Design a protein with these regions (language model features):
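A basic/glycine-biased coupling hinge at the interface between accessory DNA-binding modules
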Residues: 106, 110-117
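Hydrophobic/aromatic-lined pockets within catalytic cores
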Residues: 91, 95, 107, 147-150, ...
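Conserved RNase H-like, two-metal-ion catalytic cores of nucleic-acid enzymes
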Residues: 1-105
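Mixed-charge, glycine-rich, non-catalytic linkers/tails in nucleic-acid processing enzymes
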Residues: 78, 115-155
Length: 155
């Protein structure tokens, strides 16, 4: 696989199949900014992860999950300075492990985890096209909501 090149700061979302990131399968990562909308299956990411350590600023939802899964798989991430989950928590917004709760309260239409994968413990992995679309929607929400969350934190 060729190296991934992304221009500008970006949001990323790491999708897993299940609710326990310590043991469940990582599916892939979505990248989003005004120039890029990209989904990378996790097995492909492991072959070309260098962009995760670039100087570009990155933001995510649940950095602890992202960091743990990457480390567990011998990967690293640098310059991830904003966690939407922590920001929303500090602002007393409705947060859960499922980013859809927060996004839908902010007028995004993101499917809840169980709508895409089925009940926890009985999940079914859908086609990669569905995973990619749903994961990119989540990274888009992270990217587009960052400024508003930062402004609310500063006020």
């Amino acid at each position: 696989m060729e190296k991934v090149k992304i221009e500008g700061d970006y949001a990323l979302y790491l999708e897993i199949l299940g609710s326990n990131y310590h043991k469940d399968k990582p599916l892939g990562i979505a990248i989003y900014n005004e120039n890029t909308s990209l989904y990378i299956p996790f097995e492909v990411l492991k072959q070309a992860p260098d962009f995760l350590c670039s100087e570009q600023e990155k933001y995510t939802y649940d950095l602890k999950k992202v960091w743990y899964i990457l480390k567990k798989n011998g990967l690293d991430i640098k310059n991830c300075h904003f966690d939407t989950m922590i920001a929303a928590y500090l602002l007393n917004d409705n947060i859960k492990d499922d980013i859809a709760y927060l996004a839908n309260n902010k007028d995004y239409n993101i499917s809840f985890y169980e709508e895409v994968y089925g009940k926890i413990g009985k999940e079914v992995e859908p086609d990669i096209e569905i995973i990619a679309k749903k994961t990119i929607e989540k990274s888009r929400f992270i990217y587009e909501s960052k400024t508003e969350l930062e402004e609310r934190l500063e006020s």
